[in-house]
């Protein structure tokens, strides 16, 4: 098997420093591999695109943003995406039960099976896991601008911005049905979670050909501790503050410009057309029989 490992050296928590040593010592000798470090934004996508038809697997080493950058060029190809999670949230890896441990994630490359998953586009641009608007997108932008990465930086920003952010009313259309919804957070989910074990859409599956639209009302101070607990326990769908719809095509007409895809903030002054692309990306997942 021929493999390319693509490392984002500045992603997430800095665990990448030991990855070359671990790969050298753990990867099967039968695997012909090379390791490439990205040098600029978009470099990982370029490497993946140029090699997708001439290698057996391309492995992204980094966080959700890195996984998206490297995975997007593989959509529609026969080359699977491997993931070694080394970011702050690692949402897609967690959803796919890929180990967060670097050692165990490398072992997965040695002993894996291939799963084909859905992907999503927003105005033609792909993402893999979740898209967020409202407070969700606001925090993603704050986190992107923040000097320190990691889970606790994210939590600090949530508490800092909680009192500042006012819920908004969104114009939404799902498979031709239109409605308005006031919400604190709007999430379009292909997988179940953002990352760090924060599960926004517990009932989402990544290969069902459906998008899940989750709208969350802003909790008051008394409701907040239970809501946070529900995020991490995985039963947010039982909260009366969460509403859920599903469909294949979602349009959001007034989104106040800011949104994020897989944690990466973006802006647009146009309506957002979001479409599911069923079974369009191959990924490596644990081989439970191995």
Regions found by a protein language model. Give the residues of each.
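ATP/NTP phosphate-donor binding region
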Residues: 1-57, 177, 290
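Catalytic core of DAGKc-family lipid kinases
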Residues: 6, 76-80, 86-184
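ATP/nucleoside-binding phosphotransfer catalytic cores, i.e., glycine-rich phosphate-binding loops
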Residues: 16, 174, 180, 205, ...
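Short aromatic-hydrophobic micro-motifs that form the base-stacking/packing surface
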Residues: 59, 82
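N-terminal glycine-rich "phosphate-gripper" loop used for MgATP/nucleotide binding
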Residues: 60-65
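Short Gly/Thr/Asp-enriched flexible loops that form oxyanion-binding sites at enzyme active sites
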Residues: 66-77
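Glycine-rich phosphate/pyrophosphate-binding beta-alpha loops
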Residues: 132, 187-200, 265
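A generic structural signal for short beta-strands and their flanking turns/coil linkers
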Residues: 166-168, 182-184, 207-212, 246-248
């Amino acid at each position: 098997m021929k493999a390319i490992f693509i490392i984002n050296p500045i992603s997430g928590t800095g665990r990448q420093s030991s990855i070359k040593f671990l790969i050298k010592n753990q990867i099967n000798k039968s695997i012909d591999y090379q390791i490439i470090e990205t040098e600029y934004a978009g470099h990982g996508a370029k490497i993946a695109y140029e090699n997708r038809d001439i290698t057996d697997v391309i492995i992204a080493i980094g966080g959700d943003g890195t996984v998206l950058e490297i995975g997007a060029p593989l959509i529609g190809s026969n080359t699977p995406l491997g993931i070694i999670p080394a970011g702050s949230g690692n949402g897609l890896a967690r959803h796919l039960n890929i180990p967060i441990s670097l050692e165990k994630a490398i072992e997965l490359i040695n002993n894996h099976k291939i799963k084909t998953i859905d992907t999503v586009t927003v105005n033609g641009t792909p993402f893999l896991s979740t898209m967020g608007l409202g407070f969700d997108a606001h925090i993603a932008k704050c986190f992107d601008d923040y000097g320190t990465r990691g889970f606790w930086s994210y939590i600090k920003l949530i508490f800092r911005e909680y009192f500042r952010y006012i819920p908004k009313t969104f114009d939404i259309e799902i498979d031709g049905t239109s409605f308005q919804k006031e919400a604190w957070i709007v999430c379009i989910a292909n997988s179940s979670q953002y990352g760090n074990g924060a599960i926004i859409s517990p009932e989402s599956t990544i290969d069902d050909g459906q998008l899940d639209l989750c709208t969350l009302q802003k909790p008051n101070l008394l409701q907040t501790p239970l809501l946070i607990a529900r995020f991490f326990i995985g039963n947010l769908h039982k909260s009366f503050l969460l509403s859920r719809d599903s469909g294949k095509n979602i349009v959001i007409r007034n989104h106040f410009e800011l949104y994020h895809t897989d944690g990466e903030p973006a802006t647009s002054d146009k309506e957002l057309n979001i479409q599911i692309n069923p079974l369009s990306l191959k990924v490596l997942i644990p081989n439970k029989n191995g």
